[in-house]
Amino acid sequence: MRRAYTVKQLLESYRAGDTDPVEHVSRVLDALRRWERDVNAFISLEAEEVLIDAAEEAARRWRRGEARRLEGVVVGVKDNISTSFLPTTAGSRMLDGYIPPFNATVVERLLMEGAIIIGKTNLDEFAMGSTGEFSAFGPTRNPWDLSRVPGGSSSGSGACLAYGACDAALGSDTGGSVRLPAAYTATVGLKPTYGLVSRYGLIPYANSLEQISPMARSSEDVMLLLEVIAGGDEYDATSIYSKPTTASREEGLKPEDLSLCIPEELVEHSEEAVRKAFYNTVGKLEGLGARLEYVGLGGAEAYALPAYYTIALAEAASNLARYDGSLYPVRGSSGDYWRQAAEARGIGFGLEVKRRILMGVYVLSEGYKDEYYLAATKLRRVIRDAMLKTVGKCLVATPASPIMPPRIGERVDDPLKLYAMDVYTVLANLSGLPAIALPIEIHGGLPVGLQLIGPRLGERLLAGAANIIEDLTGLAGVVAG
C-alpha cells in the first residue's frame, strides 16, 4: 500500500509550484507502463504526445494565474460515456471502433475546466455486470490482487484510480456500478441524486435508475468533480437545475452531528470479514458521539433486489433493441431485416447481455407484464417511500458489498450469486437518492467498503460524513502497490 495525490493535494501542489502538470502526467504515464498490461483498466488511451501537449498548456495556465478548477487533473472516462475524440464502445463488440460525433455533457464540462482526459475505461458490456469480467475487451483485474475482480460495472474507473493512472474518473451507476468498484479498490464513488448530473451522451442501460457518477481517492475529490459536472442540461429532460456545494473539512460535520440508521437484518447477510469491519467502524463513530439506530426498511430488504432487476432488465431490453445490425459497426450480411438483426446481435452481444435482454423481454411479454414488471414498479414505490422516510431522520449505513472481492471467474457462471452482490447498493437507485461508498479497512490485503445513503440533494451531507470516516481510517489517497 502506498499513497498518491488526491485531487485537492495535487491542485495545492500546482499552486505552490511543488510540481507541475508536465511532471505529473509523466508520473501517470509511468504508472500506465508498469500496471496497465496486467490490469486492463482502459479500452482506449489518448496518444502520449496529446497528453503532454495538454499538460504543457495546463502548466502555462498555472504560471499565468489562469488555472481553471481542474487544470492539469488527469481523468479517466468510462467507455459508455460519449467522446468525439476517442472511441466509445460500451465494452461491446457491437460498438467496436464507434466514435460518436459529439461529447457527452459531462465530458464538455470537464474539458471546460481544464481536465486532461487520459482515456476510456473498461467496463462490463453495456454496464451490465458487477465484477468487470463481461467486457468484450477482456476482464479488468484488481490492482490490490490481480487474481480478483475490481467490481463492476465501472471496473476500469476504479482500477485506474487504484494504481495511479488517473486522479479522478467518471463511471455510471445503475445499481451500484460505481460503489462496488469503490469498495473493492479502496477508492470513493458517489452516486448523485437522480437528475443532478446530465445523462446526455451516456449509452443507456436502464434510464430510470442510472446516473453518471464521479470516482476519486477521497470524498472531497468526488465532491469537487461533482461540482463541475452537476447541473441542468437542455439535452436531458430528466436533469434538474440544482448544484451541490463543495464540502471541505473545515466546514464539515462533527461526529456528534451524525445520525446513522443501520438496517441490521440486511447487514447480517454479509460475510464475516465485511460485517466485522462495518461494525468496527460504526462502533468507533458511536464512541466519538455519533448516534446509531437499528431499523427496518419496510420490506425493502426482501424486495429491493428482485424489483431492481425486473425494472432494469425490462428497460435494458427496450434500450438495446436499437442495435439491429443496420446502424452501428457490427452489421448483419443478410438482406432480410430480421435475419440481419439476429446475425448482428448474435455476433455483437456477449453472453451476459443476451441473458439480460431475454429476461427483460420475458417480463414485458404479454401475460407476464402485470405479474412481473408492473408488480416491480409498485414495489419500487413502496421501497422509495420507506427510504425517503428513513433518510429524513438519518443516513442509512450498510457495507458497500456483502462479500470481499471474488476471484476472477468465481461468480460468472452463477447469475443469482452475481446479482446478489448488488443487494445493498440498489436501494439508492430505486429511490433516486444519493449514496457514497468509501474504504474503511484493508483486510488481508483487500479493501472493505462502507456505503452511506442520504436524502435527496444531500451530497454535501454524505461528503461531510465521509470526511469523518476518512479521518478515522486514514485511507483517503491510498493506492495499491
UniProtKB/Swiss-Prot annotation:
GO terms for molecular function: ATP binding; glutaminyl-tRNA synthase (glutamine-hydrolyzing) activity. The active site is at residues 78, 153, 177. It catalyses: L-glutamyl-tRNA(Gln) + L-glutamine + ATP + H2O = L-glutaminyl-tRNA(Gln) + L-glutamate + ADP + phosphate + H(+). Signal peptide: none annotated. Its EC number is 6.3.5.7. One of its GO terms (biological process) is translation. One of its GO terms (cellular component) is glutamyl-tRNA(Gln) amidotransferase complex. PANTHER family: GLUTAMYL-TRNA(GLN) AMIDOTRANSFERASE SUBUNIT A, MITOCHONDRIAL, TRANSAMIDASE. Belongs to the amidase family. GatA subfamily. Heterotrimer of A, B and C subunits. This is Glutamyl-tRNA(Gln) amidotransferase subunit A. It comes from Aeropyrum pernix (strain ATCC 700893 / DSM 11879 / JCM 9820 / NBRC 100138 / K1).
